[in-house]
Amino acid sequence: MKVRASVKKICRNCKVIKRNGVVRVICVEPKHKQRQG
C-alpha cells in the first residue's frame, strides 16, 4: 500500500474508487495499491 498525495492508475487493471471519503486505487497487482493521504 502506497500513501500518496496524488493517486494515479499505473496499469489498465487499476481502478480508482472512493471508500468512506478516501480515494483508493485497487488492482490485481498488489504493488499498485494506493491510497490518498
Curated annotation (Swiss-Prot):
Keywords of the record: Ribonucleoprotein, Ribosomal protein
An annotated GO BP: translation
GO molecular function: structural constituent of ribosome
GO annotations of cellular component type: cytoplasm; ribonucleoprotein complex; ribosome
Record InterPro entries: Ribosomal_bL36 (IPR000473), Ribosomal_bL36_sp (IPR035977)
Record keyword Ribonucleoprotein present: yes
HAMAP family cross-referenced by the UniProt entry: Ribosomal_bL36 (MF_00251)
Family: Belongs to the bacterial ribosomal protein bL36 family.
Official protein name in the record: Large ribosomal subunit protein bL36
Lineage: Bacteria, Pseudomonadati, Pseudomonadota, Gammaproteobacteria, Vibrionales
